[in-house]
Amino acid sequence: MEQIIYTEKTDGISIDRIRRDAAFSMPRKHLHNEYEIYYLLEGERYYFIDRRTCHVTGGSLVFIDRNQIHQTSQAGPCSHERILISLDPSPFSEFLSSTGEMSLPGFFRCHSGVLTLDKEEQVRAECLLDDAAKELHEKKTGFRHMAMSNLSRLFILAQRHMSGSSLSPVLPLSTQPKHRKV
């Protein structure tokens, strides 16, 4: 069974949260022109990105660059819950780069892959994503700015985690051809 908790969209940004209680695997590898952030709240997945397959567990963020081949498939128990964000290059890229401290293409070029958050970061990430979706749903004055602000804070959270952590990002399970067939 699939339960859509929310699905929201505005110019250049879409965000949805889905819980699946049955086994689910994407039918095929794909790519698209949007940047993608996949946050696994609970469950286990295999995530194929380019030529590597990573084991992703609850509390992990997956950053997928534009036009990067990817696919997710079942690992472990059948159920999982995830939040998926798709970002067009515009308008979010301009918003994120407005201070000159970060750029969307630069972030994804350097940080494509899996990042496992600690418990405190997981709570913050989930709140930021849920709040962004709430802004897009309610459409109050300034909702786009608030949604993009929350997503910017998610990027900063991820960048600080990566720069301040002595832990390495999740390593691929394998780069062997037989494991590329997730």
Placement of each model-derived feature along the sequence:
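Short, Lys/Arg-enriched, Trp-marked, Pro/Gly-tolerant hinge/linker segments that flank
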Residues: 111-120, 136-149, 156-182
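Broad gene-expression machinery/nucleic-acid interaction feature
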Residues: 36, 82-84, 182
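A hydrophobic/aromatic-rich effector-binding and dimerization subdomain
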Residues: 2-15, 73-134, 157-165
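Secondary-structure boundary/capping motif
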Residues: 17-19, 47, 55, 63, ...
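Short, charged/polar surface micro-motifs in flexible loops or helix N-caps
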Residues: 42-44, 61, 67-69, 78, ...
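Generic protein-terminus/edge-of-domain signal
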Residues: 1-61, 68, 100-104, 112-113
